[in-house]
């Protein structure tokens, strides 16, 4: 038993399938089956008005213009490689910035290690007062137990 009044026929000239759940194109307002409802599948003449996507750079939040026929991922990738201001790979921040205060030592550390007595900044090797010959008024004493 068929229900010719139920559903709608696909508007694609080569299809005309009776579809019980047709999809109406929001650009040309015609009904299509699931295979022909995308703009490209039925060659929608009004798709240029609707199918507009502007990708945004995930690093700097800048909209990236994409020309027709270009792949958005490739264009955004090119932007990140060339023009992006927030590219983390381009930042040349120095990691080892804390130089040892011990005379003759040229080591640098990521973390600041300040002597509690003389308040100088030292590397791991010279961080203890005895190791950097701390010249503060109170000398550290070693207790034998």
UniProtKB/Swiss-Prot annotation:
Keywords linked to the UniProt accession: Cytoplasm, Metal-binding, Nucleus, Repeat, Zinc, Zinc-finger
Binding site for Zn(2+) 3: 100, 105, 123, 126
Binding site for Zn(2+) 1: 10, 15, 33, 36
Zinc finger (AN1-type): 4-52, 94-142
Pfam families with a match to the protein in the record: zf-AN1, zf-C2H2_ZFAND2
Main location, first listed in the record: cytoplasm
Binding annotation for Zn(2+) 4: 115, 118, 132, 134
GO terms for cellular component: cytoplasm; endoplasmic reticulum; nucleus; proteasome complex
Protein localization: Cytoplasm; Nucleus
PROSITE patterns for the chain: ZF_AN1
Record-level Gene Ontology MF annotations: zinc ion binding
Superkingdom of the organism of origin: Eukaryota
BP terms from Gene Ontology: cellular response to arsenic-containing substance; positive regulation of proteasomal ubiquitin-dependent protein catabolic process; proteasome-mediated ubiquitin-dependent protein catabolic process; protein targeting to ER
Residues reported to bind Zn(2+) 2: 25, 28, 42, 44
InterPro entries per the UniProt record, alphabetical: AN1-like_Znf (IPR035896), Znf_AN1 (IPR000058)
Protein name (database record): AN1-type zinc finger protein 2A
Species, as recorded: Homo sapiens (Human)
